[in-house]
C-alpha cells in the first residue's frame, strides 16, 4: 500500500504569508546485497516482478552491477544499482545515508552477499576461517547494525543462510547447546565470542578437538542463522517496530559460481525461499524461522534436516 503525506510549508515574507502544499509519495525499497549474479541476481529478478517499489541491486563492482541491471532491463524489468562492499563499513554507511535521504526507510533487506572457499582451495585453513567468518558473519552483522535503524514497521529481512547453516552440523554438544539458545538467552556478545573462538581455534589447529566442524562455511552460516534468531527476538521486543519478520533461508544447491555450477537448481529456483520470506503477508507468524528451498519450515535446532 502506497502512503501519501501532505506537508505544509510556510513561507514568511515582509508582506504576506503564503501556504504551499507539497505532496510526495513515500517510495518503498527492497535491498539485495550481492545482487549481480547467482542467487542474488535471481532474487532481484523475482522482486522486480512483484515488489511495489524500487529494487536496489547492490554489488561491490560497479561494472558488473550495472551489467546486471542492463540484463534485467532487457527482460523488461526495472531495478536500480548502488555500490556496496559489505566488508567496508564506509561503503555500508554510504548506502545507509543514501537510503535514509532517498527513501526514509527500508521495507525489504536481503543479506545475500557471501563467500565460500572451494574444496580445492590451497589457502591455509586458518586463513579460510578468518576471511569466511569476517565476511559471512561479521560483515553481515555490520550491515544489519547500520541498516536496521532504517527498518520500517512491516519490514521483511532475509538472511541467506544455507543447508550448511543447519545446527546439526555442529557436533560439539556444548557448542550446539549455546547456539541452540539463540532467540532466548544467547546474546550477540556471546555469539560473537563463539565466532572469534572458532577463528582462534582454527589458527591454533585445535578447532576439531573443541567440537567445531572442518568447514569454515558451515560455521559462518550456523553463526548467521543464530544471529537471525537473536535479531528477531530483539526486534520483537522493540515497541517502536511492528510486524517485522526476520528469517534465515536455505536457497538449495544452486547452479552458481559458488557451487562451481554443480547445483541442479537454477538461480531463479534458488531465489524461491528468499522471495517467500521477503513477501510474507502482514501479520505473519513466520518470524525467526529456518526456511528450506521449497519454502517449508525446518526445525533449525532439532531437525531432521530435509533432503538437499
Give the role of each language-model region.
Residues 94-97, 101, 120, 125-134:
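Active-site Tyr-X3-Lys motif and surrounding loop/helix of classical short-chain dehydrogenase/reductase
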Residues 62-63, 83-94, 126, 137-140:
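The beta1-alpha1 cofactor-binding region of Rossmann-like NAD(H)/NADP(H)-dependent oxidoreductases
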Residues 122-125, 129-130, 153-241, 250, ...:
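Catalytic loop of short-chain dehydrogenase/reductase
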Residues 25-56:
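Canonical Rossmann dinucleotide-binding motif of NAD(H)/NADP(H)-dependent dehydrogenases/reductases
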Residues 51-67:
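Conserved glycine-rich Rossmann-like NAD(P)H-binding loop of the short-chain dehydrogenase/reductase
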Residues 142, 244, 248-249, 254-256, ...:
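C-terminal helical subdomain
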Residues 112-119:
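Conserved NAD(P)H cofactor-binding loop of Rossmann-fold oxidoreductase domains
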Amino acid at each position: 500500500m502506497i502512503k501519501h503525506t501532505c506537508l505544509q510549508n510556510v513561507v514568511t515574507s515582509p508582506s504576506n504569508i503564503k501556504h504551499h502544499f507539497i505532496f510526495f509519495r513515500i517510495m518503498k525499497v527492497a535491498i539485495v546485497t550481492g545482487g549481480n549474479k547467482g542467487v542474488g541476481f535471481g532474487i532481484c529478478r523475482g522482486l522486480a516482478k512483484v515488489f511495489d517499489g524500487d529494487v536496489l541491486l547492490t554489488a561491490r563492482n560497479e561494472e558488473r552491477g550495472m551489467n546486471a541491471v542492463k540484463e534485467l532491463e532487457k527482460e523488461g524489468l526495472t531495478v536500480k544499482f548502488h555500490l556496496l562492499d559489505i566488508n567496508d563499513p564506509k561503503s555500508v554507511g554510504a548506502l545507509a545515508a543514501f537510503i535514509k535521504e532517498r527513501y526514509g526507510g527500508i521495507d525489504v533487506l536481503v543479506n545475500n552477499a557471501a563467500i565460500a572457499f572451494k574444496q580445492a582451495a590451497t589457502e591455509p585453513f586458518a586463513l579460510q576461517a578468518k576471511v569466511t567468518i569476517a565476511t559471512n558473519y561479521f560483515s553481515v552483522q555490520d550491515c544489519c547494525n547500520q541498516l536496521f535503524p532504517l527498518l520500517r514497521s512491516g519490514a521483511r529481512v532475509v538472511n541467506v543462510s544455507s543447508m550448511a547453516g543447519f545446527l546439526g552440523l555442529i557436533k560439539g554438544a556444548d557448542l550446539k547447546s549455546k547456539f541452540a539458545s539463540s532467540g532466548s538467552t544467547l546474546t550477540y556478545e556471546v555469539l560473537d565470542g563463539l565466532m572469534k573462538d572458532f577463528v582462534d581455534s582454527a589458527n591454533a589447529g585445535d578447532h576439531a578437538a573443541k567440537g567445531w566442524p572442518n568447514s569454515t562455511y558451515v560455521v559462518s552460516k550456523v553463526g548467521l542463522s543464530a544471529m537471525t534468531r537473536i535479531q528477531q527476538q530483539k526486534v520483537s521486543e522493540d515497541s517502536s517496530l511492528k510486524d517485522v519478520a526476520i528469517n534465515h533461508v536455505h536457497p538449495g544447491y544452486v547452479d552458481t559460481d559458488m557451487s562451481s555450477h554443480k547445483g541442479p537448481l537454477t538461480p531463479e529456483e534458488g531465489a524461491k525461499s528468499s522471495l517467500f520470506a521477503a513477501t510474507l503477508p502482514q501479520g505473519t507468524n513466520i518470524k525467526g524461522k529456518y526456511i528450506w528451498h521449497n519454502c517449508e519450515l525446518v526445525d533449525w535446532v532439532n531437525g531432521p534436516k530435509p533432503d538437499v
